[in-house]
């Protein structure tokens, strides 16, 4: 069985993330979308909230599961028996950071490949940052993220006042 992990902050998960996951299932038998628990990064949603949202929006996706992890990504990949780390690119500006991270991961474990999927044209403009920004300004980003995420954003920003 060919397993890949698709790691990310998913703060929040967007249609672009889900598109990459769906397309990755054409290449791999199982895709694990993994929420990276980064205490040092300032995030809108907690790890538990991000995981809950990710589980909700992937429930109907065949061969996709959601989990979280707290270690180096390549070590997590090794732990779950993954042969690859899937990354999505929206624009050329994403390439440099992804390339550097791929080099680090290949140095740590050359047996785990990094597979980069280009964002589909209809999703290339979507980012979690833009979704959070819209929601913070009172606009429901319904075109960019599933309804359960829109509801969670609405609730989160209502709590903040």
Swiss-Prot record:
Its cofactor is Mg(2+). SUPFAM superfamilies: Nucleotidylyl transferase. GO terms for molecular function: ATP binding; pantetheine-phosphate adenylyltransferase activity. Substrate binds at residues 9, 41, 73, 87. It catalyses: (R)-4'-phosphopantetheine + ATP + H(+) = 3'-dephospho-CoA + diphosphate. Reversibly transfers an adenylyl group from ATP to 4'-phosphopantetheine, yielding dephospho-CoA (dPCoA) and pyrophosphate. This is Phosphopantetheine adenylyltransferase. It comes from Chloroflexus aurantiacus (strain ATCC 29366 / DSM 635 / J-10-fl). The lineage of its organism: Bacteria, Bacillati, Chloroflexota, Chloroflexia, Chloroflexales.
């Amino acid at each position: 069985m060919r397993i890949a992990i698709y790691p990310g902050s998913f703060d929040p998960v967007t249609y672009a993330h889900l598109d990459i996951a769906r397309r990755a299932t054409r290449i791999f038998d199982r895709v694990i979308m993994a929420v990276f628990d980064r205490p040092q990064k300032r995030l809108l949603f907690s790890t538990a909230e991000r995981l809950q949202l990710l589980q909700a929006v992937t429930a109907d996706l065949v061969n996709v599961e959601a989990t979280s992890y707290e270690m180096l990504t390549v070590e997590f990949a090794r732990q779950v028996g993954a042969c690859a780390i899937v990354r999505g690119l929206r624009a050329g500006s994403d390439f440099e950071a992804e390339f550097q991270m791929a080099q680090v991961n290949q140095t740590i474990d050359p047996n785990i490949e990094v597979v980069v999927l280009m964002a589909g044209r209809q999703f290339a403009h979507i980012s979690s940052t833009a979704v959070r920004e819209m929601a913070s300004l009172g606009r429901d980003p319904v075109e960019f993220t599933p309804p359960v995420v829109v509801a969670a954003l609405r609730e989160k920003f209502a709590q903040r006042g």
